[in-house]
């Protein structure tokens, strides 16, 4: 699979090396490609550009499907594991396109059955837990500043609850509960991070795009 760096200056792709898929990078003119990773035990399963220079990729060890997150510079230097923990699985939650050196990830390092969200500093490797998942959170949503502000949980096995907080210093609080026949799905925050655009079918026979106050679930327009 081919991918282009955010500044449009480099192209990356996967190709075999010693029977394993690895990352290669070349200029936009496709001249002089160079190998970035040299994995021999397992394939690079997926990768992405974190910024114009840093590439992130996923790989498991020994086929245990506990995928870990690694990072490497586009020239092949500074390769490091970010979440190499035995028995732990990692997911990328949000690549935070507007923040170069941070991403949000989920890991089950606290509890094997539950994934908690963390902010990962790509320069230092520091991980900061953003919330403790009680076990029923199915989705998280950030604002344009990369702050985790909305969560969705499953209640009673069938109903869904939207939770909200004004800042990451606060606890999430429930805003609205919907049945399996109803839907309120926040899509994106407005530019000022105060309201959200959402898809909902509440009070109507078809889903509609609305402007909503996430603190109250009130439709504004």
Predicted regions and their residues:
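Conserved beta-propeller blade repeats
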Residues: 1-14, 40-61, 69, 86-109, ...
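Short loop/turn segments that connect beta-strands within beta-propeller blades
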Residues: 27-31, 73-77, 121-125, 166-169, ...
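Beta-propeller domains
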Residues: 13-38
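Short active-site-adjacent helix-start/loop capping segments
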Residues: 20-22, 32-34, 43-46, 63-66
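Short helix C-cap/helix-to-loop transition motifs enriched in small/turn-promoting residues
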Residues: 30-34, 53, 63-65, 72-80
């Amino acid at each position: 699979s081919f991918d282009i760096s955010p500044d449009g200056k480099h192209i990356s792709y996967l190709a075999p090396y010693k029977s394993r898929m690895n990352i290669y990078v070349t200029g936009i003119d496709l001249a002089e490609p160079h190998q970035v990773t040299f994995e021999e035990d397992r394939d690079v399963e997926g990768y992405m550009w974190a910024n114009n220079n840093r590439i992130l990729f996923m790989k498991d060890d020994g086929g245990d499907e506990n995928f870990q997150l690694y990072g490497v510079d586009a020239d092949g230097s500074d390769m490091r594991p970010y979440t190499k923990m035995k028995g732990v699985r990692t997911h990328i939650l949000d690549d935070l396109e507007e923040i170069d050196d941070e991403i949000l990830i989920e890991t089950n390092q606290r509890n094997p059955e539950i994934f908690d969200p963390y902010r990962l500093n790509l320069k230092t490797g520091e991980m900061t837990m953003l919330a403790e998942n009680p076990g029923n959170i199915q989705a998280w949503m950030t604002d344009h500043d990369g702050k985790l502000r909305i969560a969705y949980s499953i209640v009673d096995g069938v109903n869904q609850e939207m939770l909200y907080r004004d800042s990451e210093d606060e606890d999430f609080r429930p805003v609205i509960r919907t049945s399996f026949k109803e839907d309120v799905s926040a899509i994106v925050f407005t530019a000022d991070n105060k309201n959200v655009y959402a898809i909902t079918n509440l009070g109507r026979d078809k889903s509609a795009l609305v402007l909503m106050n996430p603190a109250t679930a009130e439709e504004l327009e």
